Amino acid sequence: VSDNEVIFYEELNYGGASHPYKLGDDINLGNTSLNDKFTSVKVGAKVKVVAWQHYDQTGVYREWDVDQPDITDIGGLTRFRVVKSGTLPIAVRLEDLTGQEKHHYSMKVDSHDVGTAKVYSGGAGYGLVGLMPEAGPPVTTAIYVRDEKSGVYVATGSIYFTWDGETKSIRIDNAENFPKNMEHQRERRNEFTCQLKSVS
């Protein structure tokens, strides 16, 4: 595999039919014969693959920057991009601080970059909401937090993600557009927890 390409395979351990993709490819395999067919991948030295579940909007994602003999843990590959190795996926999860049961609230995040992701309160996983190359540009997403029982939206706003050159990580910048009844904290270089504090 060359430095700027990846090769997906239809069988584990790099077996079966191979399918090469290059840096910059933004692939949606939905409605094609290759949807959910890839089970292993070889990755060039200067790129990585960011893959995510697309049609059920979970935003569950994986990033692969080295060869992977088994990628089936993503639960079927439909959407992926081949990006420079320094690119970071941006991901969020929802934490409910109001005391409701697990999955009482959902947070839908709309992004021009990767589409829509939906995460639920109490869920352990992060949903992919964007991609940021080293040094930017910024990524803006719209967020909608909904009470799944009543259907009422309890928080709406936007998140403005920017590159922090000092820490080589992503940060949230737009306090004025972030919902007033929520807080956020960075868990890792690129993963954030959005906390719902109240619904009044």
Task: List each model region and its residues.
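Compact beta-sheet-dominated domain cores in extracellular/mature segments
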Residues: V1-D113, Y120-L128, M132, G136-T156, ...
